[in-house]
Design a protein with these regions (language model features):
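Short, conserved "switch-loop" micro-motifs in signal-transduction and mechanochemical regulators
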Residues: 86-87
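C-terminal output helix
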Residues: 108-117
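Acidic, metal-coordinating helix/loop segments flanking the phosphotransfer/catalytic sites
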Residues: 32-50
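Two-component/phosphorelay signaling modules centered on CheY-like receiver
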Residues: 12-31
């Protein structure tokens, strides 16, 4: 496929699960980051086709990382999907206000995740 996805989560288990789903079912190249600060620097260097990012993380949360990524000219149009256990309306609204393209809740359904990513990656 040739697409690159940046996976961002402070949980090693979640990163491994997401990476396994994407590699086995899509062949996407996956790069990872453990928090929002790391995500910004990795995104600038790696130039991913899409960012899949947790919200609640140490050092910098996903909302703030999303806002800062949108300030980077190279990342302004990169699709960002936020992932969290919280699905309350105000929390989802905060996600969209931070600049994300979409928002999904955990636990992640593999089929739903792949369908969503393929939609944003034009597949």
């Amino acid at each position: 496929m040739g697409k690159k996805v940046l996976l961002v989560d402070d949980s090693t288990t979640t990163l491994m699960m997401e990476e396994m789903i994407l590699k086995q079912r899509t062949g996407y190249e996956c790069v990872t980051a453990k928090d929002g600060l790391d995500a910004i620097s990795r995104a600038v260097v790696e130039a991913p086709d899409l960012v899949l990012m947790d919200v609640v993380m140490p050092r910098m949360n996903g909302f703030e990382a999303c806002k800062r990524m949108r300030m980077e000219s190279s990342l302004r149009k990169t699709p960002i999907i936020l992932v969290t256990t919280r699905g309350e309306e105000d929390y989802v609204e905060a996600g969209f206000q931070s600049g994300c393209n979409d928002y999904i809740t955990k636990p992640i359904n593999g089929f739903e995740l792949i369908t969503l990513l393929q939609t944003y990656l034009g597949e």
